[in-house]
Amino acid sequence: MIEVLVNDRLGKKVNVKCLSEDTVGDFKKVLSVQLGTASASKIVLQKGGSVLKDHITLEDYEVHDGTNLELYYV
């Protein structure tokens, strides 16, 4: 189990617990529930300026415990 910190452009920070084997799409579903957002499909996550694709695992993107991700809405 890892804990990932997600920041939006308004300064809101959310800690999300997940598995490193989870796909980005699964992570976005958990995140949307925590944020109270209607749809995970409206969420875009970035790490170091690169957009994370839904079908790739967090582990493949080298997202580890304590990693910061940027949150955007489309």
UniProtKB/Swiss-Prot annotation:
The keyword Transmembrane does not apply. Keywords: Ubl conjugation pathway. The keyword ATP-binding does not apply. It holds the Pfam family ubiquitin. GO terms for biological process: protein modification process. It comes from the Eukaryota. Residues 1-74 form the Ubiquitin-like domain. This is Ubiquitin-like modifier HUB1. The gene is HUB1.
